[in-house]
Amino acid sequence: MNSNYLLLPHFDPSIFTLGDSNIGLRWYGLMYLLGFVFARWLAVRRANRPNSGWTVDQVDSLLFNGFMGVFIGGRVGDVFFYNLDHFLQEPLYLFRVWEGGMSFHGGLIGVIVAMIWTSYSQKRNFWQTADFVAPLIPFGLGLGRIGNFINLELWGRETNVPWAMIFPNDPLLLPRHPSQLYEAFLEGLVLFAILNIFIKKPRPMASVAGLFLIGYGVFRFIVEYVREPEVENFFGIITRGQALCLPMIIGGAFIMAWAYSRKSAVIK
């Protein structure tokens, strides 16, 4: 082990547990909770603006559906995108949520389903819902990556950069990129700033959702180069995460082009 790099302590992933059980509050779960609290605060603030088109009750319904979408989609996505072999050997693994395991791409699919349902039940244009939701997401994503860092999981590849860190649960105790912190900064703070600056200017409907897909996809694709892959690469070229980001980038670019071609639907 190289003593020139920061050796992280063993963080306890649990804030507290009930007796000898695995049931309790974990730092990762707290990050999700704080992300939703912040999202509601920001959403209610925007809903209370004149001519927002939203009421607080509608926002609460949307966020509840979104929470369920993130939880169910994130868990199912983690199992089927990254742990399918484990699931096939032990199907009940899907329900052992206390062991952790959430996928952003699965959570995104869950949120899209939640937005479709909310738009239908509120008789609202889907893109109006998507544009409202997109700027609420990045801050929570950043907090989720902080949770990954505390859990000492999803670390980066070996490196010799001055800020490399040694994770105590790494069997090889190698200096690695703190890729969780890179993602927290890019997917969290930077993307949050980009989207919330973008919505202050006139823009066509659906453009905010498209920009979110492009922004997240590009940032995640970049960080994957320094993140230790969870599963095998595709054709030895790109990681599973990068493969899942490509449709986001392409889809986001298509949505942006389509949105700007509809010049009549400009939101001020």
Curated annotation (Swiss-Prot):
The chain crosses the membrane at residues 23-43, 62-82, 97-117, 132-152, 179-199, 206-226, 241-261. Pathway: Protein modification; lipoprotein biosynthesis (diacylglyceryl transfer). A 1,2-diacyl-sn-glycero-3-phospho-(1'-sn-glycerol) binds at R145. Pfam families: LGT (PF01790). InterPro entries: Lgt. It is an enzyme of class 2 (transferase). This is Phosphatidylglycerol--prolipoprotein diacylglyceryl transferase.
